[in-house]
């Protein structure tokens, strides 16, 4: 479940990530959300691929065509989820990230998710993350982009005190708070984490898990509300 914090509205926006239904086409994902009374979708994958820029180009031809399709839908898109990582952001990775911008700008998608990357949250990783954020500030100032980069607490930002160190250097950094990861992977109390991130959070990811090793992880995901996350 995805919760988008709508600072312009009276309520939170409820959505899901298409990562859980990656083979669906855009029309099918929008219909699924509508069928379950959700407000929006967060697009990570469509048609079996996470290369959304190529998917949109093949299916719609132009950003304007995608925009018309989304304008006709009662379900909106709250974010495009990219693969860029603040730590380890190569020139090629940045170029791939920028391919999302024409589609986001035309369709009025406000948020572009990136990962934090890294692992330890040490001074070197924080400095590299801040450098990538500065690159984005300079790029968006030059190009006049309206979409916002939101950083998911996925990797080094699950470490205790890492969020504070990042925000000290980038107090305007927009966050996607993965409530599960800072708790399960970082051992942090969600109440305390919220105190840190509430002023910067644009989206929340809500997941649940149990302490049973899975195929790839030391825990297993379960439907929200049926696991150990409280």
Predicted features along the sequence, with ranges:
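A short, Lys/Arg-enriched amphipathic alpha-helix followed by its capping loop at the start of a domain
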Residues: 11-14, 32-38
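Short polar catalytic/cofactor-binding loops
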Residues: 18-24
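Hydrophobic faces of well-ordered beta-strands that scaffold small-molecule active sites
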Residues: 12-18, 41-43, 77-82, 112-114, ...
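Gly/Pro-rich active-site loop or hairpin
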Residues: 52-57, 91, 160, 164, ...
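Short, glycine/acidic-enriched loop or turn micro-motifs at the edges of active sites
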Residues: 45-47, 155, 181, 208-211
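Glycine-rich, proline-tolerant flexible connector loops at the mouths of alpha/beta enzymes
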Residues: 42-67, 118-121
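Active-site acidic/histidine proton-transfer and metal-coordination neighborhood
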Residues: 28, 34-35, 63-76, 86-177, ...
């Amino acid at each position: 479940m995805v919760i988008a914090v709508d600072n312009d509205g009276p309520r939170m926006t409820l959505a899901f990530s298409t990562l859980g239904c990656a083979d669906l086409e855009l029309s099918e994902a929008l219909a699924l959300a509508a069928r379950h009374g959700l407000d929006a979708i967060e697009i990570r994958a469509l048609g079996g691929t996470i290369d959304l820029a190529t998917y949109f180009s093949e299916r719609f031809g132009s950003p304007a065509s995608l925009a018309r399709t989304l304008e006709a839908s009662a379900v909106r898109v709250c974010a495009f989820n990219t693969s860029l990582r603040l730590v380890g952001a190569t020139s090629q990775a940045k170029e791939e990230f920028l391919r999302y911008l024409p589609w986001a700008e035309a369709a009025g998608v406000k948020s572009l998710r990136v990962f934090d990357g890294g692992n330890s949250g040490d001074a070197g990783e924080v400095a590299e993350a801040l450098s990538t954020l500065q690159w984005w500030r300079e790029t968006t100032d030059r190009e006049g982009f309206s979409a916002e980069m939101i950083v998911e607490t996925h990797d080094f930002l699950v470490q205790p005190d890492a969020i504070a160190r990042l925000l000290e250097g980038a107090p305007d950094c927009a966050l996607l708070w993965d409530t599960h990861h800072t708790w399960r992977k970082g051992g942090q109390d969600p109440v305390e984490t919220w105190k840190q991130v509430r002023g910067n959070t644009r989206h929340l990811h809500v997941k649940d898990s149990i302490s049973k090793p899975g195929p790839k992880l030391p825990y297993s995901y379960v439907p929200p509300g049926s696991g150990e996350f409280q």
